[in-house]
C-alpha cells in the first residue's frame, strides 16, 4: 500500500509539471486573488519538478541521517550518566559503557540529567537562528537559496559529529552543547526549513503551494518510517553503528544539494525594481533596520501577525515531542529502541494522512470548490484542535497509542499555515519572501529557547513527583497550545475571499 501511495504522489507532481508547462498556453479559469504573485511563466514544468524532487530528496536524506542518530544518542547519554552515577555512589558497574543494561539507567537522577542535557541543547541550538536568520535570509535573497542550504546542511552534519565525538571520548556531556556553534554555518534547522519553503514558493503558484507542502511533508516522513526501525535494529548490536551511519547519511544529503537548481533567478521576474535584496530601501540598509522593517510589515497585517504568532505552537509541541523517547521509556517501561519503533508507527499514520489531505486539496483545486486561502485556514484550525487534544491525552492516558494517533492527525497544521502565510505575504511583499521566512525562523527559535527549558523543567518536576505526574510536560504543552490557538481563531480573511468560488463551465 505504501508504494501505491508514493506512486500517486509522484503522479501528482507530474500533473503539477504539466500544468506549469501549459500556463503560457491557456488562461486560468479563475483569476489569482488581488495582488497575488505567481512565479514567472517562463519557468518550464520540468524545472519545477526537478526543484521539488531535489528539495524532497535532500531533505529526506538529511532527516534520515538525523533520525537514525536520535535514539542511540539518548542511549549513549543514559549509559555515560549511568556509569558516572554508580561510580559516584561507590558501586561502579563491572561492564563497559556500551554494555550497561538499560534497566539500570531509569533512576530519576539519571533521567533528570538526560532531560537537562536535551533541554539546554534546545536553548543553544536556537541561538544561531536568532542572530543569523535575517543575514542568511538576506543572503538567500541576493546570492541564492542553494548556497545557504549547503551551509545549513553542512553545519547540521558537523554538529551531529561533534556531539558523537564527545560521547566517544567520554568527555563531560555538557560539551555536547558546543555542537550548536557548528550551526552558525547556515543558521541551523530553522533557517534550513525557511529557505526550503522559500525555494518551493519561488516556483510553485499560490493555488498549488499547499498541496506541494503536504506532499513534501509526507515524503519527509519516510525518514521516520525507515530510519527508526533501522536504528532500533542496529542498536540491538551496538549503539555506535547507527550513529556513524547517520553522520554519513547527513554528509550525503549535503552533496545532493549541489544538483539543486537556483530558484532565485526564477522569482526575480516578480520583484519590483526599486526593492533591495531583503525588502529594505537604500536609506535603511542596516541589519537592524531591515529586521525592524520586516517585523513592522508582519505586525501591520493582523492576519499575517496572527499566523506567525500561531506558529509558536510548533515550537511547544516539537519541544515536548523531543522528550517522547525518554518519556515513553520511563512511563511505560519500554526500551529506547522500542520507543523509536513507536515513532515509526506515528510516521506511517501521518504519512497516510498527509497524502489523503493532499489528494483532497488536488480535488478542491480542480473543482474550484474552495478558495485556497480559506481552505488552508480551515485545515490549520482543525489540525490545531487535534494537536491540543493529542498532547492532553498523552499527559493523562495510561496507554500511549491513542494519544499519538490523535496528535498525529494534526499533522496538516504546519504546511497549511506556511502556505497561507506565503500567499498573504506575497500579495503585498513580493520581493523579500526569503526574509519573511527568516523572520519566522527567528520567532520560532525564540519560542524554542523558551519552551525547551520549560518542558525540560516540567519533565524533571514530574519525575520528582512520581507516578502520573511524569506526564506534566505534555499537560503544560497542551495548555500553552490551547492559549495560542485563540490567536489563530482571530484570523479573518478579507470578506471577498470567504465565499467559495466555482469554475465556470
Curated annotation (Swiss-Prot):
Keywords: Membrane, Transmembrane, Transmembrane helix, Transport. Pathway: Secondary metabolite biosynthesis. CDD domains: MFS. InterPro entries: MFS, MFS_dom, MFS_trans_sf. It holds the Pfam family MFS_1. The chain crosses the membrane at residues 48-68, 117-137, 148-168, 181-201, 216-236, 240-260, 304-324, 343-363, 377-399, 403-425, 439-459, 469-489. Disruption phenotype: Does not alter the yield of aspercryptin significantly. GO terms for biological process: transmembrane transport. It is a multi-pass membrane protein. Induction: Expression is positively regulated by the aspercryptin cluser-specific transcription factor atnN. It is found in: Membrane. One of its GO terms (molecular function) is transmembrane transporter activity. GO terms for cellular component: membrane. MFS efflux pump; part of the gene cluster that mediates the biosynthesis of aspercryptins, linear lipopeptides built from six amino acids including 2 highly unusual and nonproteogenic amino acids, 2-amino-octanoic acid (2aoa) and 2-amino-dodecanol (2adol). Belongs to the major facilitator superfamily. This is MFS efflux pump atnC. The gene is atnC.
Amino acid at each position: 500500500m505504501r508504494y501505491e501511495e508514493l506512486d500517486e504522489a509522484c503522479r501528482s507532481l507530474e500533473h503539477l509539471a504539466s500544468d506549469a508547462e501549459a500556463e503560457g498556453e491557456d488562461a486560468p479559469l479563475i483569476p489569482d486573488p488581488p495582488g497575488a504573485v505567481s512565479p514567472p511563466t517562463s519557468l518550464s514544468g520540468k524545472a519545477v519538478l526537478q526543484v521539488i524532487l531535489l528539495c524532497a530528496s535532500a531533505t529526506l536524506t538529511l532527516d534520515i541521517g538525523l533520525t537514525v542518530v536520535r535514539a542511540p544518542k539518548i542511549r549513549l547519554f543514559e549509559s555515560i550518566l549511568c556509569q558516572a552515577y554508580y561510580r559516584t555512589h561507590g558501586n561502579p558497574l563491572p561492564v563497559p559503557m556500551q554494555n550497561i543494561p538499560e534497566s539500570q539507567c531509569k533512576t530519576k537522577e539519571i533521567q533528570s540529567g538526560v532531560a537537562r542535557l536535551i533541554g539546554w541543547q534546545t536553548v543553544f541550538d536556537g541561538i544561531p537562528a536568532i542572530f543569523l536568520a535575517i543575514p542568511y535570509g538576506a543572503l538567500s535573497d541576493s546570492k541564492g537559496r542553494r548556497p545557504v542550504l549547503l551551509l545549513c546542511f553542512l553545519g547540521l552534519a558537523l554538529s551531529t559529529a561533534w556531539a558523537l565525538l564527545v560521547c566517544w571520548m567520554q568527555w563531560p556531556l555538557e560539551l555536547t552543547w558546543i555542537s550548536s556553534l557548528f550551526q552558525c554555518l547556515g543558521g541551523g534547522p530553522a533557517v534550513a526549513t525557511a529557505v526550503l519553503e522559500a525555494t518551493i514558493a519561488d516556483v510553485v503558484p499560490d493555488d498549488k503551494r499547499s498541496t506541494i507542502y503536504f506532499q513534501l511533508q509526507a515524503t519527509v516522513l519516510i525518514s521516520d518510517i525507515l530510519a527508526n526501525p533501522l536504528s532500533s535494529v542496529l542498536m540491538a548490536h551496538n549503539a555506535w553503528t547507527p550513529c556513524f551511519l547517520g553522520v554519513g547519511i547527513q554528509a550525503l544529503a549535503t552533496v545532493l544539494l549541489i544538483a539543486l537548481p537556483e530558484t532565485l533567478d526564477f522569482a526575480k521576474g516578480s520583484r519590483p525594481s526599486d526593492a533591495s535584496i531583503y525588502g529594505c530601501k537604500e536609506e535603511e540598509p542596516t541589519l537592524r533596520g531591515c529586521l525592524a522593517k520586516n517585523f513592522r510589515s508582519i505586525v501591520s497585517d493582523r492576519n499575517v501577525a496572527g499566523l506567525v504568532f500561531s506558529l509558536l505552537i510548533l515550537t511547544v509541541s516539537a519541544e515536548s515531542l523531543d522528550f517522547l523517547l525518554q518519556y515513553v521509556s520511563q512511563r511505560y517501561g519500554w526500551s529506547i529502541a522500542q520507543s523509536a519503533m513507536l515513532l515509526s508507527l506515528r510516521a506511517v499514520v501521518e504519512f497516510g494522512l498527509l497524502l489523503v489531505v493532499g489528494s483532497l486539496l488536488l480535488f478542491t483545486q480542480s473543482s474550484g470548490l474552495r478558495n485556497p486561502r480559506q481552505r488552508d485556514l480551515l485545515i490549520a484550525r482543525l489540525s490545531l484542535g487535534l494537536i491540543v487534544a493529542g498532547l492532553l491525552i498523552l499527559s493523562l492516558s495510561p496507554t500511549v497509542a491513542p494519544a499519538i494517533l490523535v496528535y498525529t492527525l494534526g499533522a496538516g497544521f504546519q504546511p497549511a499555515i506556511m502556505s497561507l502565510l506565503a500567499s498573504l505575504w506575497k500579495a503585498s511583499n513580493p520581493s523579500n519572501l526569503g526574509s519573511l521566512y527568516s523572520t519566522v525562523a527567528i520567532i520560532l527559535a525564540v519560542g524554542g529557547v523558551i519552551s525547551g527549558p520549560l518542558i525540560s523543567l516540567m519533565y524533571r518536576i514530574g519525575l520528582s513527583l512520581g507516578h502520573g505526574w511524569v506526564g506534566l510536560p505534555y499537560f503544560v504543552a497542551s495548555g500553552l497550545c490551547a492559549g495560542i490557538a485563540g490567536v489563530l481563531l482571530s484570523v479573518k480573511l478579507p470578506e471577498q475571499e470567504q465565499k467559495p468560488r466555482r469554475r465556470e463551465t
